[in-house]
Amino acid sequence: MKIWVDADACPGVIKEILFRVADRAKVEVTLVANHSMRIPPSRYINMVTVPSGFDVADDEIVKRLDAGDLVITADIPLASEVIDKGGVALNPRGELYTEQNIKSILNMRDFMDTMRASGVQTGGPAAIGASEKQAFGNQLDRFVTKHHKPV
């Protein structure tokens, strides 16, 4: 099991949690982004830099993903592709995307896109607070404990 991170939009506090989990649990964490990022020195943390472009990082994650891998992303269409390929998707707020909920989440996203396109100002999500950070950490710990077997 590996952890893939849609790193361009992933908040720094979430990356820090992932870095700690990588070393503690000895699980491979790979950040994928269209620009280089600073990562701590660790045999478990990797960086993949892809060319700039629409969905290039997403496509790279899906290409490299194996069934059972975890992907950290707030990108709902990417989460849907991950689930279709047998992976698991977790957003930075600690919400797990599943086969049971991804279709309704995609529908809500499409509805909000339609609203914005018609001129309705919907606002964006609030900044990640302590409760979301804790929810993410808890969900990540549960997943890693259940699915990762250190070599």
From Swiss-Prot:
Transmembrane segments: none
Matches recorded under Pfam families: DUF188
Family per similarity comment: Belongs to the UPF0178 family.
Protein's name according to its UniProt entry: UPF0178 protein Swoo_1444
Native species: Shewanella woodyi (strain ATCC 51908 / MS32)
Lineage: Bacteria, Pseudomonadati, Pseudomonadota, Gammaproteobacteria, Alteromonadales
